[in-house]
């Protein structure tokens, strides 16, 4: 019998946590015992996993020494509290929040881009999962960077409300229903009405005029590519779509590269689906439930001699969070456990 691993999911009742549960089953991850953890409020809720019923436990009462691997998606404050405790018990923590991403001695990993960085988990038994928008962009840009190098990235994102969790999904649904029935729309989760609207602010505003979400893309790109010379100029926009993020990516390369060569490279890249000609991916039609990154509208930039433009789409809850975390765990048990 192949080795099995006891897995804990912190934040099991959230959008990402529930999706991690699905992905573990779909990818047949070798789970021995499964521990679903959440706050006292969710204690006792049950889920089905591999034909069995699993009960949600109160994280405050959990013995971390029972787990080998833990997947965290319960928010930065809970990661800050519980990840070091779990790690001290020998658990390898894969954290979906931003809390540990920018610490120099912890790996920030996209398995298709920098799987070798996983080895750094030995520093503190913690691996950070990048921001959803960074993940899909870098999966698409990795082969270009390897081929000719990247100097600068201009990117505009069009991010669905599921990036704000279940509360974001509920707010879009509720506002849409009210407005279509002639009622005023209440806003709680977003700074402005999200139904039938676009909001060019995700996360808090920083002193430099960028949002924290935008600066995440800057910091994470440089760390994952291990190249602080790459400049990144993002604008992140929340759009009234339930699932899936899209990005208009404009890249300036160190050496010119033809669009057809980019297409050829991407067609050979693990985890990428290329759309050709006038066919292009969209969040609503293509992204939902997919674990890979979709790229279309690939063309040379008519305004720059070394420019390439791409349209990049992915399911932010899966590849942008849950699937990427499970893929990290797969590499971990294959190469390091």
Model features per residue range: what roles?
Residues 1-194, 229-231, 293-294, 298-304, ...:
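N-terminal Rossmann-like NAD(P) cofactor-binding subdomain of oxidoreductases
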Residues 70, 161-337:
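Charged docking surfaces used in two-component/phosphorelay signaling
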